[in-house]
Design a protein with these regions (language model features):
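Sec-dependent N-terminal signal peptides
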Residues: 6-8
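C-terminal motif of bacterial Sec signal peptides marking the signal peptidase cleavage site
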Residues: 13-16
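Tryptophan-anchored aromatic micro-motifs
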Residues: 24-40
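Hydrophobic/aromatic beta-strand elements that line small-molecule binding cavities or substrate pockets
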Residues: 51-53, 70-74, 102-108, 123-125
Length: 128
């Protein structure tokens, strides 16, 4: 009986220590396919580049450019708010124009595709 109780206690402790990803379709590793800049009226095909947004829990990481960016985000309704803690040198390479407080409208989000739009850019991603 003591062994069973000890085993149950261990299982409960192990299960309670895990954090569950509450991001739904947003969580994961996203490869940027296209960056459309409204200011310059240009569309940049980024499929050959390695521009990635990694999203997990409330953290995000930007990789593929000259430097790595790390920050936090909030997904509220149809908006994604990004606050970078470690701002990459080439932050516009990732579609950020105000890396300390950027807001994106979530145009489309499912398990395979994400489209974000700010007042400066529109970003197309596919899940990697």
């Amino acid at each position: 009986m003591k062994k069973v109780l000890f085993l149950l206690a261990c299982i409960v402790l192990l299960v309670s220590c895990q954090k569950l990803d509450h991001n739904g379709d947003l969580g994961g590793y996203w490869k940027m396919l296209q960056l459309e800049e409204f200011e310059r009226d240009t569309v940049i095909d980024t499929r050959q580049d390695d521009r990635f947004w990694a999203i997990q829990l409330d953290l995000m990481q930007l990789t593929g450019g000259e430097s790595i960016g790390k920050g936090r985000f909030q997904h509220v309704g149809d908006s994604l708010y990004v606050q970078m803690i470690y701002v990459p040198v080439d932050y516009r390479y990732y579609g950020l124009y105000n890396p300390k407080d950027d807001r994106f409208e979530v145009i489309h989000l499912d398990r395979k595709k994400m489209i974000l739009k700010s007042k400066y850019v529109k970003l197309d991603f596919r899940k990697f």
